[in-house]
């Protein structure tokens, strides 16, 4: 039954989860957190909202370098998700749509199935990737009513640990065309921590706060060299510079950008950091990872290289259907910069069109909802009976 299916986009940073008959997923931090202010308690998932002081928050992550390695942490988070404090339903006797990383290790896939079938007693599993679900949702959203079997598109998933470029030709992933860049939201937050700690004050233990700063003030420069000219003009520097008021967890629970000329009460007593080129040099790493010593190409070059591994007759449609998902796709200026750089790398007679949905974080989950409610969903589910008869190997035949 479609209304019994759980859809879980199990990301390294957040898990997007809900029933297929619900309109919106719950977005839950996929980690356990500990705070200095409450040493006796661990916060799981959205319980962090109950923490009075999130300074120096310590994270215990289920994912390491993009892969699910800490199963104790993951099971703790899943237990919370499926409790009354989460989505309020058990996995027992339900089908589940669950995502995994591209090119996932076999041992991790085996452990995932084992826990789902033996610990949570699910009826069946549909295992896929976030890129596949995004492609499925893209078809569902298509005004031309393209079918999955005729879809030619490129999915750029700017995730927490990695950025993946995944081409689809006639609805199937072109495995030899998949490209991975070891740069994502986590690396950007770490770089911003380094810059603020070096130039202003030590925030190396403040991942939670710095991640909020990144989300609030960072943007992608359309022309990086021109943007760096801010240092040659005081007027340009003032245009880019913002003062960010740091939280003190007493009067200010979450940091914010100070509005010049409109100070809030007691604002002058609050601790602030002044940010200028940090605002655009941090997201620049998505386009030039070598800036911090990661010897890999940026996203535009990865897309151009992925194109070379695809049939030439599909190139035109692939470039017309480039879909960008993931949290870091939300930086202002990301799309114009990517289009500009990619335009210079592909033939002039081919048009480039980029699409970023309104909600790139939840987009794959909505694709999972479409999959779970499709008429032939049951045909692709790996059931408890299949698992008992064939074990892990049988799912690869689906």
Curated annotation (Swiss-Prot):
The keyword Cytoplasm applies. One of its GO terms (cellular component) is cytoplasm. GO terms for molecular function: chromatin binding; nucleosome binding. GO terms for biological process: heterochromatin organization; transcription initiation-coupled chromatin remodeling. Disulfide bonds: none annotated. Keywords: Cytoplasm, Cytoskeleton, Nucleus. It is found in: Nucleus, Nucleoplasm; Cytoplasm, Cytoskeleton. Its main location: nucleus. The keyword Membrane does not apply. Transmembrane segments: none annotated. Pfam families: Actin. Gene3D superfamilies: 3.30.420.40, Actin, Chain A, domain 2, Actin, Chain A, domain 4. It comes from the Eukaryota. Belongs to the actin family. ARP6 subfamily. PANTHER family: ACTIN. This is Actin-related protein 6.
């Amino acid at each position: 039954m479609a209304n019994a299916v759980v859809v879980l986009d199990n990301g390294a940073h957040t898990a997007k989860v809900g029933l297929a008959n619900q309109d919106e997923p719950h977005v839950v931090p996929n980690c356990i957190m500990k705070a200095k202010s409450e040493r006796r308690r661990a916060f799981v998932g959205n319980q962090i909202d109950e923490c009075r002081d999130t300074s120096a928050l310590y994270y215990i992550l289920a994912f390491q370098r993009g892969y699910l390695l800490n199963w104790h942490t993951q099971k703790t988070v899943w237990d919370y998700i499926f409790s009354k404090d989460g989505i309020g339903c058990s996995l027992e006797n339900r089908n589940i749509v669950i995502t995994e990383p591209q090119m996932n290790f076999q041992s991790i896939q085996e452990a995932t199935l084992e826990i789902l079938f033996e610990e949570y007693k699910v009826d069946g599993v549909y295992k896929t990737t976030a890129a596949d679900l995004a492609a499925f949702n893209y078809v569902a959203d298509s005004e031309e009513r393209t079918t999955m079997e005729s879809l030619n598109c490129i999915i750029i998933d700017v995730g927490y640990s990695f950025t993946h470029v995944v081409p689809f030709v006639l609805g199937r992933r072109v495995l030899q065309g998949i490209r991975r860049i070891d740069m994502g939201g986590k690396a950007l937050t770490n770089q911003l921590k380094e810059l603020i700690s070096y130039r202003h004050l030590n925030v190396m233990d403040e991942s939670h706060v710095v991640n909020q700063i990144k989300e609030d003030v960072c943007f992608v420069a359309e022309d990086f060299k021109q943007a760096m000219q801010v240092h040659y003009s005081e007027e340009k520097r003032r245009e880019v510079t913002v003062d960010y008021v740091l939280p003190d967890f007493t009067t200010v629970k979450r940091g914010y950008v100070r509005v010049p000329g409109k100070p809030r009460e007691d604002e002058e007593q609050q601790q602030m950091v002044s940010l200028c080129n940090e605002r655009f040099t941090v997201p620049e790493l998505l386009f030039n990872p070598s800036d911090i010593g990661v010897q890999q190409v940026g996203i535009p070059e990865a897309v151009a290289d992925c194109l070379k591994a695809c049939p030439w007759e599909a190139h035109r449609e692939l470039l017309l259907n480039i879909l960008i998902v993931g949290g870091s796709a939300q930086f202002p200026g990301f799309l114009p910069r990517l289009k500009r750089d990619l335009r210079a790398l592909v033939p002039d007679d081919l048009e480039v069109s980029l699409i970023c949905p309104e909600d790139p974080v939840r987009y794959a989950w909505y694709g999972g909802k479409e999959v779970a409610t499709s008429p032939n969903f049951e045909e692709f589910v790996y059931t408890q009976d299949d698992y008992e008869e064939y074990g892990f190997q049988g799912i690869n035949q689906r």
